[in-house]
């Protein structure tokens, strides 16, 4: 029977947080951010397994969090790579052999909703690849190399991509292997497909589905959690 798998990428060092602790281990309401992220997927009925990608020296810390909070469905914890795309590739190689749909999600994005997860799976079955996100609230400018504004795109044409980014497993694995062969660099997994002419359907995420990257995000995260509980 085919499975829906999720790869949680927790191999970042969080330099922008100005903390010696990796952002996924910082706490909100006395629980680590990683707990909230793992728990959301482990309690979702459509998710069959979780592969957690972590810094090699943090694998034991991750294992302790999983045990402490009785997180189910984590099948493996694997070490990350030099770049995010290398970490994702390690995760892709570790999922179950009968995985059909794979969701790739940031560990530091703990407020993903059940609907976002479910819709991602549904759109993959329909289109082969999908990513959630939001239309920017602010006006966005394009500037030249000297720092002067040269254009103002229509906000309705712009999309701030979030995670999970969701794919047919064979498609994303094939594109990642081509990426390694061609030694290309990307900043997210939708770009992996774009490099090889594949389309990604963009669907509605949530303005609350933030990635906790800076100290200000921690404060906002506490406010979001209070509204959700």
UniProtKB/Swiss-Prot annotation:
Kindly list the residues the record flags as site (Transition state stabilizer).
16, 23
Q: Look at the named UniProt entry and state the broad enzyme category this protein falls under.
A: transferase
Q: Where is this site: Positions MEP for the nucleophilic attack?
A: 155, 211
Q: One short Pfam family name for this protein? A: IspD
Checking PROSITE patterns in the record gives: ISPD
Tell me the keywords, alphabetical order. Answer: Isoprene biosynthesis, Nucleotidyltransferase, Transferase
Catalytic activities: 2-C-methyl-D-erythritol 4-phosphate + CTP + H(+) = 4-CDP-2-C-methyl-D-erythritol + diphosphate
E.C. number: 2.7.7.60
One GO-annotated biological process of the protein: isopentenyl diphosphate biosynthetic process, methylerythritol 4-phosphate pathway
Pathway listed for it is:
Isoprenoid biosynthesis; isopentenyl diphosphate biosynthesis via DXP pathway; isopentenyl diphosphate from 1-deoxy-D-xylulose 5-phosphate: step 2/6
Kindly give the Gene3D superfamilies that the UniProt entry links to this protein: Spore Coat Polysaccharide Biosynthesis Protein SpsA, Chain A (3.90.550.10)
Cite the NCBIfam families for this sequence: ispD, PRK00155.1-3
Similarity comment text for this entry: Belongs to the IspD/TarI cytidylyltransferase family. IspD subfamily.
| Role, per record | Catalyzes the formation of 4-diphosphocytidyl-2-C-methyl-D-erythritol from CTP and 2-C-methyl-D-erythritol 4-phosphate (MEP).
Q: What is this protein called?
A: 2-C-methyl-D-erythritol 4-phosphate cytidylyltransferase
What organism is this sequence from? Answer: Clostridium botulinum (strain 657 / Type Ba4)
Traced from the root, the source organism's taxonomic lineage reads: Bacteria, Bacillati, Bacillota, Clostridia, Eubacteriales
């Amino acid at each position: 029977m085919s499975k829906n798998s999720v790869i949680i990428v927790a191999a970042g060092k969080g330099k922008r947080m100005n903390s010696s602790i990796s952002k996924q281990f910082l706490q909100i309401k006395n629980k680590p951010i990683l707990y909230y992220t793992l728990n959301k997927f482990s309690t979702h009925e459509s998710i069959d397994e979780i592969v957690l990608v972590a810094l090699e020296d943090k694998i034991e810390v991750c294992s302790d969090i999983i045990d402490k909070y009785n997180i189910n469905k984590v099948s493996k914890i694997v070490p990350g790579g030099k770049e995010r795309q290398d970490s994702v590739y390690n995760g892709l190689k570790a999922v179950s052999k009968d995985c059909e749909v794979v969701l790739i999600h940031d560990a530091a994005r703990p407020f993903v909703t059940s609907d976002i997860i479910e819709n991602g799976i549904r759109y993959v079955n329909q289109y082969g690849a999908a990513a959630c996100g939001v239309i920017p609230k602010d006006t966005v400018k394009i500037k030249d190399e000297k720092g002067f504004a040269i254009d103002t795109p229509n906000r309705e044409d712009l999309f701030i991509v979030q995670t999970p980014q969701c794919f047919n497993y064979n498609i994303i694995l094939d594109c990642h292997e081509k990426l390694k062969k061609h030694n290309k660099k990307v900043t997210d997994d939708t770009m992996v497909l774009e490099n090889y002419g594949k389309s990604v359907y963009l669907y509605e995420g949530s303005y609350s589905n933030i990635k906790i990257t800076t100290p200000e995000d921690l404060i906002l995260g506490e406010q979001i959690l209070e509204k959700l509980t």
